[in-house]
Design a protein with these regions (language model features):
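Glycine-rich loop/linker segments at domain edges
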Residues: 30, 36-39, 103-104, 175-220, ...
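Surface-exposed extracellular loop regions of Gram-negative outer-membrane beta-barrel proteins
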Residues: 291-296
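Flexible, low-hydrophobicity surface segments
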Residues: 2-178, 200-203, 278, 286-288, ...
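Charged, low-complexity, helix/coiled-coil-prone segments
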Residues: 12-27, 85, 160, 181-194, ...
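Solvent-exposed alpha-helices and their adjacent loops that cap or buttress functional pockets
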Residues: 33, 51-55, 110-112, 117-122, ...
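Gly/Pro-rich active-site capping loops and adjacent beta-alpha segments
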Residues: 15-19, 108, 135-159, 180-185, ...
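Alpha-helical support elements that line or immediately flank enzyme active sites
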Residues: 61-91, 127-147, 220-263, 270-289, ...
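Short, surface-exposed loop/turn segments at secondary-structure boundaries that line and modulate
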Residues: 89-123, 157-172, 238, 242, ...
């Protein structure tokens, strides 16, 4: 009988890298020893939900069940009467504090809480601060919101039709759902290649939506010290320095008074780069109550209102000669309904994108003040004559 050991080749002993122990070796050259593993395999990791501060309160977010609707009224009387509720914050409250809108990492703004209307299902409407997590969640059911339902845009391919409702009507002069164009390269040279091509091959591609779904959801603890004016944040962020800059803009504090602590992160995959309204709301909650406030989203919130990716309907064209050669010019157009913030990944040629919104999406964006979305369409052609028209399908 042949054993596994007899069948398996013995591992070859590799010669050690002479630069591994050299004092003057370049950074990153040679083997890098991992130091974080022992505490994780022993269950000693310290994640955000393991952080408990003295006197800490807990927050929960009321989200819109509708994709597109006017907010007629918000009655928080019953929620405030709950014995364990310390505060209920609405968009109107934030307007009084000049905190209704927050800048994004894409140099636009997003609504921290909806004020005039909701623009996607799951948009933040109110924030409850209570003594414990369960009381905060229970109090959400005591908030009475009256909505005036509006038509929603659910098909990105129809978002630019003249009969579609305008989602971004907060922007002055906006009469359609065309959010922005992004273009690079030589338009005339690209068009000339296609005009002279012997063959133009077209294809439509549907790329379904994907979500990073990290094991740990997003959350934050904000601790505003009113005596020193210092703000300490414990956050599930992959970009603590960028977050500090945004918080400085939101709260009007100098950056040196803001400390962002990123503890052990239970997965991110890009999902924890953006700055979500829940983060800002913990800061507001701490300012209002004078105590640390923790917010930790549940799984359904994470899937509903944080960054996702893909979800494209793309139309592509490749120009070629009759003998199969592809000239070194290409083009891509990417209309997206979810306001994707990231630039195209092209290295040469002409890249063109148009962005259009669909109401039920959960975007993370440069273009919608109440939205956040995932990543952009990507084309890896280095030197080819292609052009892509891409529309995110549905959300």
């Amino acid at each position: 009988m042949t054993t596994i050991q007899e069948r398996s080749p013995m591992p070859q002993e590799r010669e050690p890298n002479p630069a591994m122990t050299a004092a003057d070796r370049p950074i990153g050259y040679g083997r890098v020893q991992r130091k974080e593993d022992p505490r994780f395999v022993r269950g000693k990791g310290r994640y955000l939900d393991d952080v408990v501060l003295p006197g800490m309160l807990h927050g929960a977010i009321l989200r819109s069940p509708l994709a597109h609707a006017r907010v007629v009224s918000i009655d928080t009387t019953e929620a405030l009467a709950h014995p364990k509720v310390r505060a209920v914050i609405t968009g109107k409250d934030l307007e009084g504090l000049n905190l209704a809108w927050a800048p994004t990492l894409s140099a636009d703004v997003q609504a921290v809480l909806a004020t005039d209307k909701v623009r996607f299902q799951g948009q933040e409407v109110a924030f409850v601060v209570a003594d414990d997590h369960y009381s905060a969640r229970d109090a959400l059911e005591l908030i009475d919101v009256e909505y005036d339902v509006l038509p929603a845009v659910v098909d990105a391919r129809r978002a630019l039709d003249p009969d579609m409702p305008v989602i971004r009507d907060d922007k002055e002069g906006k009469t359609d759902n065309h959010i922005f164009d992004w273009e690079a390269g030589d338009r005339d040279a690209t068009d000339a290649v296609f005009a002279a091509a012997d063959v133009v091959v077209t294809q439509d591609v549907l790329y379904p939506r994907v979500h990073p779904a990290p094991m740990e959801t997003c959350g934050q603890i904000a601790d505003m010290d009113k005596v020193t004016g210092k703000l300490t944040l414990y956050c599930t962020t992959q970009a603590p320095h960028a977050h500090r800059t945004v918080y400085a803009l939101v709260a009007g504090l100098p950056e040196h008074l803001i400390r962002v602590v990123s503890p052990d992160i239970g997965g991110g995959f890009g999902n924890k780069v953006g700055l979500y309204p829940g983060y800002v709301l913990t800061v507001v909650g701490s300012i209002v109550t004078g105590k640390p406030v923790k917010w930790m989203e549940d799984r359904s919130e994470n899937l509903m209102s944080t960054s996702f990716a893909r979800d494209y309907h793309m139309h592509g064209e490749i120009a070629a000669t009759s003998d199969g050669r592809i000239p070194p010019r290409w083009r891509r157009a990417a209309p997206s309904p979810t306001w994707t913030p990231s630039p195209a990944s092209s290295r040469s040629g002409r890249t063109r994108r148009r962005h259009t919104p669909t109401a039920p999406c959960t975007p993370w964006s440069p273009a919608c003040p109440s939205t956040r979305s995932g990543s952009s369409a990507r084309t890896s052609a280095a030197a080819s004559a292609t052009r892509w028209a891409c529309t995110r399908a549905t959300c």
